[in-house]
């Protein structure tokens, strides 16, 4: 019977129970619910699993496929890693909001109709805003309001597009489409807002660094990657996405190189990396779409690892600007090593997950004789190495001695970082483990 229930419900139940329990029972829920969700995800068969009629439309809240399962798997894995990282430091209401936020991402993954898709999409927007507010500072409250306004706008645009498509086609099915009329353009724009595409990329770099060190780990994973999943399902091969993706790649690099705040560097880097995925969706071949999915999978792991590393530094020192840090390798060696592994992965270094997945996108561009795209992506990879591969770890852990002598990360934060470091290396050394599950 469990395969007839959306795995998102498990995380919704966990979000409620986290607020009703405490102590060891709460810890068991925080760590156990994602694992149970992971089991439920792999019990969902391919095809439409549950369906019912609503206002004459066929609602399909649970539809399985290899692509959907791949994204839901990494979302559940991220919840476990994030929960392990946060359960001793985060307040209960932040954990509850983060788990509800993740439930929305899992729900989007399995939504077979546009109505269910939209409901989970807005569910995500609501609880991700709360996660930002849980930063607890005036800056977090202001950034959360701006974040909410931007996602409210994106939700309205998406809703207008969905209504237009439903009225014109009579169908609510999640199916591939091209941006050829007003309604489909509205859907595409709504999705791209969540992907932090230009000209509205600033909401991401504005909000994520204002969240708590634990909250930013969750924020790094879900919103932009559900947008990538939606683009793969709804707009594969949409030509405009190639240009949009390339712009995001360059935009993220330039602003990351100019930034001083460690988490804001990583936030701009998210925009850069999602640009690779958006460009791959625009190329639209099987290799490109698999590359986008695989890179999203790998990106969630190494980006969360980088935010974990930065968050541990902020938790121990209270400082987040690169110019205030330096020399922390002496007293935070584990955090430094894990941060370096994440930096190597995002830079596409051989034997790391980033190399395994980023090369698929470059190869897809080469296969289609997109020479300019290929060389721009190659140049962008070098730029990523400068800001995330060198700038972040060098200024934080090496460079000059800041005089700070903090302890290394608490054991639960360290365990989460070691887990995700291992996954970065495992996928890089044994890429077939990921390739076997690509759609």
Q: What positions do the PLM features span?
A:
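Transmembrane helix-loop-helix hairpins at membrane boundaries of multipass inner-membrane proteins
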Residues: 1-96, 170-176, 202
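Membrane-interfacial helical/loop segments at transmembrane boundaries in membrane proteins
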Residues: 50-56, 360-364, 433-439
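Glycine- and aromatic-enriched alpha-helical transmembrane segments of multi-pass membrane proteins
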Residues: 414-436
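Core segments of transmembrane alpha-helices
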Residues: 76, 223-227, 418
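Alpha-helical transmembrane segments of multi-pass membrane proteins
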Residues: 38-48, 346-349, 425-432
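Hydrophobic transmembrane alpha-helices and their helix-loop junctions in integral membrane proteins
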Residues: 81-96, 102-117, 127-412, 423, ...
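Membrane-helix interface and helix-disruption motif detector
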Residues: 1-3, 234-240, 439
């Amino acid at each position: 019977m469990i395969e007839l229930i959306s795995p998102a419900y498990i995380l919704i139940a966990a979000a409620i129970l986290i607020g009703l329990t405490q102590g060891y029972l709460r810890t068991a829920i925080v760590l156990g619910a994602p694992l149970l969700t992971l089991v439920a995800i792999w019990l969902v068969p391919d095809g439409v699993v549950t369906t019912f009629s609503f206002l004459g439309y066929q609602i399909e809240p649970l539809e399985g496929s290899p692509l959907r399962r791949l994204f839901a798997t990494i979302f559940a894995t991220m919840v476990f890693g994030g929960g392990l990282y946060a359960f001793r430091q985060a307040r209960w209401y932040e954990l509850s909001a983060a788990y509800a936020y993740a439930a929305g991402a899992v729900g989007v993954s399995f939504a077979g109709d546009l109505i269910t898709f939209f409901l989970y999409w807005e569910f995500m927007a609501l609880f991700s805003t709360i996660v930002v507010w849980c930063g607890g500072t005036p800056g977090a409250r202001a950034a959360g309001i701006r974040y909410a306004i931007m996602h409210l706008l994106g939700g309205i645009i998406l809703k207008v597009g969905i209504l237009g498509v439903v009225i014109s086609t009579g169908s609510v099915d999640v199916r591939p489409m091209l941006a050829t009329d007003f309604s489909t353009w509205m859907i595409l724009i709504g999705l791209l807002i969540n992907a932090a595409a230009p000209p509205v990329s600033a909401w991401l770099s504005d909000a994520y660094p204002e969240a708590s060190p634990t909250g930013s780990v969750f924020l790094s994973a879900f919103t932009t990657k559900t947008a990538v999943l939606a683009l793969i399902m709804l707009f594969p091969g949409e030509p405009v996405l190639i240009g949009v993706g390339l712009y995001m790649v360059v935009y993220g690099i330039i602003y990351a190189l100019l930034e001083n705040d460690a988490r804001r560097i990583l936030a701009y880097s998210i925009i850069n990396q999602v640009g690779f995925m958006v460009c791959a969706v625009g190329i639209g071949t099987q290799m490109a779409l698999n590359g986008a999915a695989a890179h999203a999978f790998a990106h969630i792991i190494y980006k969360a690892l980088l935010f974990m590393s930065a968050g541990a530094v902020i938790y121990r020192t209270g400082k987040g600007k690169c110019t205030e840090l330096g020399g922390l390798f002496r007293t935070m060696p584990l955090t430094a090593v894990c941060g370096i592994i994440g930096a190597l992965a995002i830079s596409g270094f051989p034997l790391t997950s980033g190399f395994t997945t980023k090369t698929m996108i470059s190869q897809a561009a080469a296969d289609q004789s997109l020479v300019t795209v290929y060389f721009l992506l190659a140049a962008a990879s070098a730029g990523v190495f400068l800001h995330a591969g060198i700038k972040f770890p060098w200024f934080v852990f090496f460079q000059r001695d800041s005089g700070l002598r903090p302890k290394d990360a608490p054991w639960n934060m360290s365990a989460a970082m070691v887990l995700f470091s291992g996954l970065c290396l495992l996928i890089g050394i044994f890429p077939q483990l990921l390739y076997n599950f690509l759609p």
